[in-house]
A protein has these predicted regions:
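A glycine-rich, often tryptophan-bearing local segment used as a flexible ligand/cofactor-contacting loop or short
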Residues: 706-818, 847-848, 852
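A short beta-strand element within beta-rich, extracytoplasmic domains
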Residues: 181-205
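Pro/Thr/Ser/Gly-rich low-complexity, intrinsically disordered linker/stalk tracts
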Residues: 473-516, 550, 565-583
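Aromatic-Pro/Gly-enriched surface loop or interdomain linker
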Residues: 81, 96-104, 112, 282, ...
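Short beta-strand-plus-loop segments that form exposed binding edges in beta-rich domains
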Residues: 253-264
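Beta-strand-rich modules
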Residues: 545-566
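Active-site-adjacent mobile loop/cap segments within catalytic or ligand-binding domains
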Residues: 252, 269-277, 352, 358-380, ...
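Active-site microenvironments of hydrolase-like enzyme catalytic domains
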Residues: 294-390, 422-445
Length: 863
């Protein structure tokens, strides 16, 4: 009996010791119940079962760093297949993962610069620049008792902290809407484009949790509440917005002293754009945009203390960069409900960190290396945060790996490889004081991996899997319910329902891998003329009616919403109403392609041929280093010049334009100058599904862009799918008038029936590819003009477009610089058609584009 009692006692004590050593496995009652660090109060949809009020630290791996031993700036990983890990993982995290998390309501911090904008403008009270203006009414602005940000000209030395170099301002809050004190931050924007907006302030004892910031952007305004009780003395991200070039109150930020609480509102600098690296190491700065640098340099620019920025005291930037990602996370989270015992923190309730990496390793048999997870449970502090077991990190890593395989295979119908979960001593999983994981997404050294990994649809699917894992993990950690945000709607179309009123209509998209991702409402976003998109209106039905003001081009995009958040948007569609118009032109958007560069993959060679076809990223891409030069498969697994995949660095720092899904806007703008016509638009999918009666339209403008079946993309694209051909044929047979433009509309039609259709209906034949991409001139129609044909940052290019020749009674209307046909026109008693083998939206000059469009429409409409 005594032995049995002793055994029982031993087991009980052991269990207690185990629990004491490892801690609880969920947050239990530990939770943050206050207001979020940042909230967009202009968001039209409510999120109740997503990641609302969850604060996360997410980053892409590595970045450019200074090697003090060699006295040079360098990448942390080698150049392979047109990229390096330092560049590649950003292309998953920034355009896909972070927006998905934010669409679910999360507040995301990242210790590397997140804005692919090379310009930077700072407006601050300490600057002589006159973009800062205070107004004191009932309450007066005064200096805070603690230092603030100040900027000086030129670069910054190691250890220099800009957030203790100046002053900050404060004012007592006011509950009433009238007689508010305010600060206006009005920058001079050097170039029109998208700019991240960061604010800064100082946290005081009586700081309010709902400081009101208003961002004015291209004629729109978006309101934010910032919780100034946390996160003072660093850059706080509000969002990314379209700004016009120049200095205007329509492109500014306003901070007021309005609050629901009695307290203090503080003001410091506001930053527009990511900018260039400005931390000098050795004798120079990196010379690259800040978004390409490692976290070590961003954390310094963001005001982190020296023991966060550089644990080596400036002697080892490589180690500092790895450590600073986690240390800044801890610094921000210190003093919050999740890290209550950490002193001198910023009280931001960050509760999870994730490092997104890619890995090395090859498979000579052509198989995949796949995904690996990493956690640390045996090193570091025995527990995390408020007594949480390190096993919570292992659970996160395991779920990330398992779900990646499940979601990729189910969504893309491919086989995906996963490895395991390593429980090892890595800085990015040892140092964070909250649950953390490293996700090695794939092998950047193994071409079968990176061939899939550079497909934008793969990146979207992987990022969505990571987002869903974090969503479900957080629900488990807090014992709450979750709903997955929907996918973007499809079959978007606009039609007139009366003389001045149009109807926008769309369909929900199902998610085969997630039953909760069902939309319950939709956000309709509108842009009129040259203004930016508004903040949207939330509607319950899958349609929306709106009356148009005449003479203005309206642009629309739709997102799907539910309790879990908001989807990515649809393509942009456009509409235009002309007073007295009796005829309507329909624009069909048939350009949806997203792809990697051209693929070479045989027994002798592997790689991406960027010169032949650079592919199409979602909106844009800063992840390419340069053109691959070594395709020799026998050099697999090596590094340096002799390695398979080695290439140049001529594209480093370039944000290459991709498919922004808004080219109906450019066509509608050009068509609005052509005559007395109304204009509507639709997705090609709506036509293919029989949802559009083409016979209602006087003229159809089919936008194909760079659409084609490239043979390697994970999603099937085609310029003229059989269903679209059938609808266009029927339209033309009824005396229709058709304008078609696209780079590959002829080469994409190689089947005998396809070539016959081109000949019989478009009156064109394929005459090879026009390979002289560096001569962009096109001539004809009484003029000559240039088009985008090469990799650039302004607009996707018509890379190696088709030469086309006329058949029957058609004629060549435009030619490339070498004399080959670039456009074919046909007017018969049966129908009229005008075909260009380059996208009209690629014409560089908008005024020339308008004139060319007017000439084409005049030709097609004339009798």
């Amino acid at each position: 009996m005594k032995i049995k009692w002793l055994c029982t006692a031993f087991i009980a004590v052991s269990t207690l010791n185990l629990y004491a050593q490892t801690g609880k496995i969920t947050w239990d009652k530990t939770d943050y119940q206050g207001k979020p660090w940042v909230k967009n109060v202009s968001r039209p949809n409510e999120i109740s079962e997503g990641l609302q009020n969850r604060h996360l630290s997410i980053w892409a791996s590595h970045g450019r760093y200074y090697d003090s031993k060699k006295g040079t700036w360098k990448w942390q990983r080698p150049i392979l297949f047109g990229t390096t890990e330092d560049l590649y993982t950003q292309t998953i995290v920034l355009p896909y993962l972070i927006p998905m998390l934010e669409n679910a309501g999360a507040i995301v911090f990242t210790p590397r610069e997140r804005d692919w904008q090379k310009n930077e403008v700072i407006v601050d009270n300490d600057s002589k620049y006159n973009g800062y203006k205070e107004e004191s009414l009932k309450k007066k602005w005064e200096n805070t008792s603690v230092p603030g940000f100040a900027q000086h000209y030129g670069s910054y030395s190691d250890g220099e902290n800009p957030f203790i170099a100046g002053t900050a301002r404060q004012v007592k809050s006011r509950k009433r809407k009238s007689k508010l004190s305010s600060v206006v931050y009005q920058p001079t924007i050097p170039e029109s484009g998208r700019y991240a907006v960061y604010v800064s302030y100082q946290t005081q004892k009586k700081s309010v949790d709902d400081a009101e910031y208003i961002v004015f952007h291209k004629g729109q305004e978006t309101h934010f509440h910032v919780n100034q009780r946390m996160g003072g003395g660093t850059w706080v991200y509000l969002g990314t917005f379209e700004f016009d070039k120049g200095n205007s109150i329509n492109n500014s930020v306003v901070l007021t002293n309005r609050s629901t609480h009695k307290g203090i509102v503080t003001a410091d600098a506001v930053r527009f754009g990511g900018g260039m690296g400005n931390i000098i190491r050795g004798t120079s700065v990196s010379g690259l945009p800040r978004f390409l640098e490692g976290a070590r340099y961003y954390t310094q620019w963001a005001g982190a203390p020296r023991n966060v920025v550089s644990t080596s005291n400036g002697s080892n930037d490589y180690n500092d960069d790895i450590n600073s990602r986690s240390l800044m996370t801890n610094w921000l989270a210190g003093g919050s409900s999740y890290l209550p015992h950490v002193k001198d923190g910023k009280m931001v309730p960050i509760e999870l960190s994730l490092a997104v990496h890619s890995d090395a390793g090859v498979k000579s048999d052509g198989s995949l290396v796949g995904t690996l997870g990493i956690c640390t449970t045996q090193q570091g502090n025995s527990t995390l945060g408020d007594g949480l077991s390190r096993q919570a990190s292992k659970t996160l890593a395991q779920q990330l790996v398992a779900n990646a395989k499940k979601d990729i295979e189910k969504s893309l119908n491919i086989s995906w490889q996963t490895r395991s979960v390593w429980d090892r001593n890595y800085s990015e999983t040892r140092l964070p004081a909250v649950p953390s994981a490293i996700l090695e997404t794939l092998s950047h050294q193994n071409f079968p991996d990176i061939k899939l990994g550079q497909d934008p649809n793969f990146k979207f699917t992987l990022a969505r899997s990571i987002y869903k894992t974090i969503l479900k993990y957080e629900a488990d950690m807090h014992h709450t319910r979750y709903v997955v945000q929907p996918l973007a709607p499809n079959s978007f179309k606009i039609e007139y329902i009366s003389a001045k009123k149009i109807r926008l209509q769309w369909k929900a998209t199902s998610d085969v891998s997630e039953p909760t991702a069902i939309p319950t409402s939709y956000n309709v976003y509108t842009s009129i003329g040259n203004s930016g998109f508004d903040n949207g209106v939330n509607v319950r039905d899958s349609y929306y009616d709106i009356e148009l003001e005449p003479g203005m081009v309206y642009n629309f995009k739709i997102t799907a919403c539910n309790r879990g958040g908001e989807s990515f948007p649809t393509e942009t569609l456009s509409a235009f109403q002309r007073n007295g118009a009796k005829q309507t032109i329909l624009i069909i958007n048939g350009f949806h392609r997203l792809s990697s560069p051209a693929v070479i993959n045989n027994n002798l060679e592997q790689g991406f041929d960027i010169e032949a076809d650079p592919g199409l990223s979602y909106i844009n891409n800063a992840g390419w280093s340069g053109r691959q030069s070594n395709f020799d498969i026998s050099m697999m697994g090596k590094e340096g010049v002799d390695a398979l995949g080695y290439g140049g660095e001529e594209l480093v720092g370039k944000v290459i334009a991709g498919n922004n899904f808004s080219y109906t806007r450019e066509h509608a703008e050009a068509l609005s100058h052509t005559g007395n016509y109304n204009i509507v638009s639709c997705s090609s999918k709506a036509v293919e599904n029989g949802e559009i009666d083409l016979s209602k339209y006087t003229l159809v403008d089919l936008v194909l862009g760079n659409e084609k079946d490239d043979g390697h993309s994970l999603i099937y694209y085609k310029s003229f799918k059989p269903s679209l051909r059938q609808k266009l044929s029927a339209y033309l047979q009824k005396h229709g008038k058709l304008l078609v433009s696209g780079s590959y509309l002829a080469s994409d039609m190689q089947g005998a029936d396809e070539q016959l259709w081109l000949k019989n209906y478009l009156k064109v034949t394929y005459d090879g590819s026009n390979a002289n991409n560096y001569n962009s001139t096109i001539s004809g129609m009484g003029t000559s003009f240039d088009i985008y044909r090469t990799i650039n940052e302004q607009h996707y290019g018509a890379y190696t477009p088709d030469n086309i020749s006329p058949t029957d009674n058609a004629f060549c209307a435009l030619t490339y610089a070498d004399g080959h046909g670039a456009a074919v026109a046909y007017k018969g008693n049966d129908y009229s058609v005008f075909t260009t083998s380059f996208p009209l939206e690629c014409i560089k000059s908008s005024s020339i584009r308008n004139n060319i469009m007017k000439g084409i429409i005049t030709y097609l409409m004339s009798k």
